[in-house]
């Protein structure tokens, strides 16, 4: 318990000295959270953008908002959380039948959330099991 007390003091000191965003710190070392049975809301608005799937923005783990406009209510995502990839989907002049790295500047696998990515532009990163 003493170690946790010291950690809390260091975090508060870092926030004070470096004016760090407390929201960033809370996501990096999240507090114990009760398991939420509330459903993720897709799309949701966070950090001036629409998100159509779980995100890891400001966090080490994927999470989602429980409200359309993020208001601080969130939960960690699971493999059962929607939305699912849609296969096949249209990307540029190709019909894509599985997760692809094509066109992603970070060279990560992604998929479309609709049958026509060119038209809708809705996508998510693929998980190891292509959920």
Swiss-Prot record:
As given in the record, the signal peptide range reads 1-22
Q: Does the keyword Repeat apply?
A: yes
Q: What is its main location?
A: secreted
Q: Which residues form the Fibronectin type-II domain?
A: 35-79, 80-128
Places the protein is found: Secreted
One GO cellular component this record assigns the protein to is: extracellular region
Q: What does this protein do?
A: Binds sperm in vitro but has no effect on sperm capacitation. Also binds gelatin and heparin, but not chondroitin sulfate B or phospholipid liposomes.
The name under which this protein is listed is: Binder of sperm protein homolog 2
Q: Please give the organism.
A: Mus musculus
Q: What is the lineage of its organism?
A: Eukaryota, Metazoa, Chordata, Craniata, Vertebrata
């Amino acid at each position: 318990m003493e170690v946790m007390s010291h950690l809390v003091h260091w975090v508060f000191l870092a926030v004070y000295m470096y004016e760090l965003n407390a929201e960033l710190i809370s996501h990096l070392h999240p507090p114990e959270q009760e398991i939420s049975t509330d459903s993720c809301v897709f799309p949701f608005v966070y950090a001036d953008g629409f998100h159509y799937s779980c995100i890891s923005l400001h966090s080490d783990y994927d999470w989602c908002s429980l409200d359309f406009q993020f208001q601080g209510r969130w939960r960690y995502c699971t493999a059962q959380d929607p939305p699912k990839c849609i296969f096949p989907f249209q990307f540029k002049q190709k019909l894509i039948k599985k997760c692809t790295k094509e066109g992603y500047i970070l060279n990560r696998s992604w998929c479309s959330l609709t049958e026509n990515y060119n038209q809708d532009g809705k996508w998510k990163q693929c998980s190891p099991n292509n959920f």
